[in-house]
Amino acid sequence: MRIGHGYDVHRFGEGDFITLGGVRIPHKHGLVAHSDGDVLLHALSDALLGAAALGDIGKHFPDTDPRFKGADSRALLRHVVAIVAEKGWKVGNVDATIVAQAPKMAPHIETMRGSIAEDLGVAVDQVNVKATTTERLGFTGREEGIAVHAVALLMAR
């Protein structure tokens, strides 16, 4: 059994929606990123890679590589799952915490869980996503961006 932790942050910029957990959410800003900016899937990918001692998404999908410009983070996550499986691991469960003042995440959580479960090849009850605010403190509280913490449990195949 292995446990990994992932963390990612993206700042708000131009746009009228964000993508989190593979779900498009209307918002007054977009997220600035080299890929599609799905901070939730980036943190989950890092947690999975960390648990398998395979580095991080920057190593596998560098933002200096034009192939990943605007990349679909769901495709990147599925690739991470394949890399982890090649090393003899399968996902036991994942848990993520979205830290954001806005937009409200509650209406989208179940859809995120389903999308993530599909990409991980696991049941929805092996995926947990929750959200919190920082009571208007820090960069997330000032609505400058979004952060996500994620943990993943891997089990031998």
UniProtKB/Swiss-Prot annotation:
Disulfide bonds: none annotated. It comes from the Bacteria. The keyword Metal-binding applies. Binds 1 divalent metal cation per subunit. Pathway: Isoprenoid biosynthesis; isopentenyl diphosphate biosynthesis via DXP pathway; isopentenyl diphosphate from 1-deoxy-D-xylulose 5-phosphate: step 4/6. PANTHER family: 2-C-METHYL-D-ERYTHRITOL 2,4-CYCLODIPHOSPHATE SYNTHASE, CHLOROPLASTIC. This is 2-C-methyl-D-erythritol 2,4-cyclodiphosphate synthase.
